[in-house]
Design a protein with these regions (language model features):
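Internal helix-loop-helix
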Residues: 31, 35-102, 142-149
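A short core secondary-structure module
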Residues: 135-183
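Short Gly/Pro-enriched turn/cap motifs at secondary-structure boundaries
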Residues: 98, 113-116, 140-143, 162-163, ...
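Structural signature of FAD isoalloxazine-binding scaffolds in flavoprotein oxidoreductases
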Residues: 52-64, 117-121, 201, 207
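Glycine-rich beta->alpha junctions and the first turn(s) of the following alpha-helix
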Residues: 182-252
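C-terminal helix-coil-helix/basic helical segment that borders enzyme active sites and/or dimer interfaces
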Residues: 13-21, 250-251
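A structural signal for short hydrophobic beta-strand segments in well-ordered beta-sheet cores
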Residues: 123-126
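A short, Trp-centered hydrophobic/proline-enriched beta-strand micro-motif
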Residues: 101-109, 153
Length: 252
């Protein structure tokens, strides 16, 4: 991983930092080299084409990734493990293409006015026969490039609990290009130059029952599995950043 970073990533840092963009051809080059090196989808199970590395191993890799621009290392590719909840045709339509790099996904949770506070979420989906009708918006949804689909979290009802009503959150697989689904690039990142954010809006988007990821109402549980480990990887990235800047300071 260190050799890959020094050869394929570090040489492009100055350009990305000054220009604020990662040209698509450069991103695809990094993606291709990552696949050849066996780094792409290293976090996913071997039986579906991933690297099958342990969480500890991935954390060590993330520490190395943290030594460079997020905009560059995100092209190496680490599909969200939430997609492991795919079943039936979802596996061939979403999971496997993400593992091979044919498709890219977005994790769409944060909203205007609510941020990542899921209990403040306003995006909602109501039943219409066997289908769902999705409405709402998401922002600050990040990724290296325009995605092929988004994993969208929306309120699908209320559950009575001992602490009072609790929003029932469900995850949906929503393809870019679906009628009523609009996506555009959002605000530029100050510290993550070249890393894209997207704004998503949903206006009466009709989704079939096969576009529910996992079970209706278990969106929070799905999100928690990924976010919990993701926080560890963020910490590993931060350690890598600190390690590199100390090294650069010593050299200077």
């Amino acid at each position: 991983v260190k050799a890959f970073m020094e050869k394929e990533i570090f040489p492009h840092e100055d350009f990305v930092d000054k220009s604020g963009v990662v040209p698509d051809d450069l991103g695809r080059q990094i993606e291709k080299k990552a696949k050849e090196a066996g780094l792409y989808s290293a976090n996913m199970p071997e039986n579906i084409g991933g690297g099958g590395l342990s969480k500890k191993a991935i954390s060590l890799i993330e520490r190395e990734y943290g030594k460079t621009s997020h905009a560059l290392h995100s092209w190496i590719g680490r599909p969200t493990e939430i997609l492991l909840a795919c079943v039936g045709d979802q596996i061939s339509n979403y999971l496997q293409p993400c593992v091979t790099g044919e498709k890219r996904e977005l994790f769409a949770l944060s909203e205007p006015g609510a941020g990542s506070d899921v209990m403040g979420m306003k995006s909602n989906a109501r039943r219409d026969g066997a289908d769902w009708i999705l409405n709402g918006s998401k922002h600050f949804i990040s990724g290296p490039c325009m995605p092929d689909f988004a994993i969208v979290f929306a309120v699908t009802g209320l559950d009575d609990t001992k602490r009072g009503p609790r929003k029932r959150i469900t995850a949906f697989l929503v393809d870019v290009g679906t009628r009523g689904f609009e996506i555009s690039e959002g605000n530029k990142s100050v510290s993550y130059r070249g890393y894209k954010t997207f704004q998503l809006s949903f206006n009466d988007v009709r989704l079939g029952p096969d576009q529910v990821l996992g079970e209706e109402g278990n969106g929070l549980e799905l999100a928690g599995k990924w976010l919990g480990m993701g926080r560890i990887w963020v910490g590993a990235c931060c350690c890598g950043k600190a390690e590199r800047i100390i090294g650069l300071a010593n050299e200077w």
